[in-house]
């Protein structure tokens, strides 16, 4: 899949690097005890320093992208890269309309389109481990996962009716890393979303496509009370790269320079 997306972007004009440091929050990385335990990483997942977008990508930002890269407009995109519902809430191929406010996180967007957006600004989608690492923080603690009240707050969002209008991105208080909206706004694509529940022994073999689709390694749930993680894994691993839903968006990451 990565080779396909790279080839696509080679023929696109590059939108430029995401130079504004304020859009990204730096995270130091380290050994992270994931709620998902891989057989080959029982002591924790090693996460290199990286930076994560403070907020999810908005409709306005994605509109700028599709105007610059018209092959990602909903009436031109190849169906192998986006299903028919892709950006279906927009008024038109290059018009947002009343159902897609500029400041709301973009949804109805496929993995392929999200990945292309990130690559067009010199970034990438975060891995599951990076996303989980950033999402473990609350407003004051870098790891709040053992707090039952914090977990209950997240589960309350998951039980919210999905037909409610989305708030604007960036309304939540930043967490301890300076990242907003990790919970309570939209689900988010990760680079390796489809490998989360797949068994295999290819995880460290170096083929990006095999890792993405075939090689997660055997998984177990280390913290069985963290139902929110189970829900995220179940949701993401049920999707194809061309799928789009009303409550699934994304944000970009970049490796430390």
Language-model-detected regions and their locations in the chain:
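Mature N-terminal segment immediately following signal peptide/propeptide cleavage
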Residues: 24-31
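Bacterial N-terminal signal peptides
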Residues: 6-15
């Amino acid at each position: 899949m990565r080779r396909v997306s790279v080839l696509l972007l080679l023929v696109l004009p590059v939108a430029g690097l995401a130079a504004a440091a304020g859009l990204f929050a730096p995270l130091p990385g380290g050994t992270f005890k994931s709620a998902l335990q891989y057989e080959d990483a029982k002591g924790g997942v090693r996460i290199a320093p990286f930076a994560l977008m403070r907020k999810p990508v908005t409709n306005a930002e994605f509109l700028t992208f599709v105007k610059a890269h018209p092959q990602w407009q909903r009436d031109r995109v190849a169906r192998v890269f986006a299903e028919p519902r892709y950006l279906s809430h927009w008024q038109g191929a290059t018009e947002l309309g009343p159902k897609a406010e500029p400041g709301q996180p973009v949804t109805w967007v496929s993995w392929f389109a999200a990945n292309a957006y990130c690559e067009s600004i010199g970034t990438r989608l975060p891995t599951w481990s990076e996303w989980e690492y950033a999402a473990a923080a609350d407003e004051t603690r870098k790891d709040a996962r053992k707090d039952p009240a914090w977990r209950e707050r997240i589960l309350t969002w998951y039980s919210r009716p999905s037909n409610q209008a989305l708030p604007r991105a960036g309304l939540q208080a930043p967490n301890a890393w300076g990242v907003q909206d990790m919970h309570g706004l939209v689900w988010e694509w990760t680079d390796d979303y489809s490998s989360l529940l797949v068994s295999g022994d290819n995880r460290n073999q170096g083929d990006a496509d095999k890792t993405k689709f075939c090689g997660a390694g055997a998984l177990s749930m280390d913290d069985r009370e963290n139902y929110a993680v189970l829900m995220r894994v179940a949701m993401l691993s049920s999707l194809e790269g061309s799928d789009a839903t009303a409550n699934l968006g994304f944000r970009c990451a970049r490796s430390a320079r």
